[in-house]
């Protein structure tokens, strides 16, 4: 895992088209902004896992 340090307002690049910007830090919460092309899905991990679980459940019931 690559670990990077960024301050509020600083950005990191993921590939050529995705940027992740630190918008704010308050206590143990970090607000980030993600700019990505429409064809790149961006989800919180727990939402992504739910989507994957629903996809696999749909496949089993078909």
Curated annotation (Swiss-Prot):
Its main location: cytoplasm. GO terms for biological process: mRNA catabolic process; negative regulation of translational initiation; positive regulation of translational initiation; regulation of carbohydrate metabolic process. Transmembrane segments: none annotated. GO terms for cellular component: cytosol. Pfam families: CsrA. Keywords: Activator, Cytoplasm, Repressor, RNA-binding, Translation regulation. GO terms for molecular function: mRNA 5'-UTR binding. The keyword Nuclease does not apply. The keyword Cytoplasm applies. It is found in: Cytoplasm. A key translational regulator that binds mRNA to regulate translation initiation and/or mRNA stability. Mediates global changes in gene expression, shifting from rapid growth to stress survival by linking envelope stress, the stringent response and the catabolite repression systems. Usually binds in the 5'-UTR; binding at or near the Shine-Dalgarno sequence prevents ribosome-binding, repressing translation, binding elsewhere in the 5'-UTR can activate translation and/or stabilize the mRNA. Its function is antagonized by small RNA(s). Belongs to the CsrA/RsmA family. PANTHER family: CARBON STORAGE REGULATOR. Homodimer; the beta-strands of each monomer intercalate to form a hydrophobic core, while the alpha-helices form wings that extend away from the core. This is Translational regulator CsrA. The gene is csrA.
């Amino acid at each position: 895992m690559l670990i990077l340090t960024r301050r509020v307002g600083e950005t990191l690049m993921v590939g050529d088209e995705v940027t992740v910007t630190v918008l704010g830090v308050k206590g143990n919460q970090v607000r980030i902004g993600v700019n990505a092309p429409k064809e790149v899905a961006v989800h919180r991990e727990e939402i992504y896992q739910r989507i994957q679980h629903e996809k696999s459940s749909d496949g089993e019931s078909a």
